[in-house]
Regions:
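Helix-coil boundary and interhelical linker segments in multi-pass alpha-helical membrane proteins
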Residues: 1-10, 74-104, 135-141, 176-188
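Interhelical loop and helix-boundary elements at the membrane-water interface
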Residues: 2, 18, 23-73, 114-127, ...
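Alpha-helical transmembrane segments of multi-pass membrane proteins, especially transporters
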Residues: 12, 16, 61-65, 69, ...
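Alpha-helical transmembrane segments of multi-pass membrane proteins
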Residues: 15-18, 77, 108-113, 149-153, ...
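Interfacial segments of multi-pass membrane proteins
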Residues: 50-54, 76-79, 108, 125-156, ...
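A cytosolic-side transmembrane-helix exit/cap motif
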Residues: 122, 146-150, 182-189, 206-213
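Long C-terminal subdomains/extensions of small-metabolite kinases
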Residues: 130, 177-178, 185-186, 190-198, ...
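Loop-to-transmembrane alpha-helix initiation sites
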Residues: 143, 159-166, 181-192
Length: 227
């Protein structure tokens, strides 16, 4: 296939549906016979899986959500390279010809997770899948954002603060590291950050009102959080 727009569209659709797989919900049902949407924040991501179903389910959710994001990029990258853009695309993609294509695919995977068609277009908040796509896209930025997340959570004990810091840091890091990348790539990285921040709107409200739950590896919840 030598049509970049058609190839990008196909890869984006596939990535959207891969990103949409609700591993947190599936694992909660398999290991705990629990619908994690019915307790805690009601979210299907790692943090709520930890609060409702425990560390094992949370760890597997984190791993699989990261992997599904990474797989989308690892599959798409050689396909983009085969278009004939040349050697740099097959190695890095950021800052090279066709960089916008992987940007669109990154965005599609994150949107699939947040707006899962398997769950009536409700889903997670995009942090783990976002980490997966960014690590596969350009791992130094991914590791930098992971470090920022860990430091923010260690200081505040709020996972949401770390998530927001990483989301805001993504477009800044992408522009700083690849200032000459395409406008399309910059736009996609910005949209990932904006969407993840939007997905945390309830957390932002709780942080402002002092109702946000701090990270705990032992405390379990069985009822929905107060709004």
């Amino acid at each position: 296939m030598h049509n970049p727009i058609l190839l990008t569209a196909i890869c984006a659709v596939v990535s959207f549906f891969i990103g949409a797989i609700p591993f947190g919900l599936i694992l909660g049902r398999v290991f705990n016979h629990t619908d994690i949407r019915k307790a805690g924040s009601g979210n299907i991501g790692t943090t709520n899986a930890l609060r409702v179903a425990g560390p094992k389910v949370a760890a597997l959710t984190l791993l699989l959500d990261c992997l599904k994001g990474a797989i989308c990029i690892l599959i798409a990258r050689p396909l983009i390279a085969d278009l004939g853009y040349g050697f740099p695309v097959s190695i890095m993609a950021p800052g090279a010809a066709g960089d916008w294509m992987l940007g669109v695919i990154c965005l599609a995977a994150v949107w699939g997770h947040i707006f899962s068609p398997y769950l009536n277009f409700h889903g997670g908040k995009g942090i783990a899948v976002g980490l997966g796509v960014i690590l596969a896209w350009y791992w130094p930025i991914g590791l930098s954002l992971l470090g920022m997340f860990i430091v923010a959570v260690a200081i505040t004990k709020f996972v949401s603060v770390g998530s927001l810091a990483a989301a805001i840091g993504l477009p800044i890091a992408a522009c700083a590291v690849f200032p000459y990348s395409s406008l399309g790539l910059k736009f996609c990285m910005a949209m990932i950050g904006i969407t993840v921040v939007w997905a945390h709107r309830a957390n932002i409200k709780k942080l402002m009102t002092g109702k946000e739950s701090k990270l705990s590896f032992t405390k379990r919840v069985t009822e929905p959080d107060d709004k």
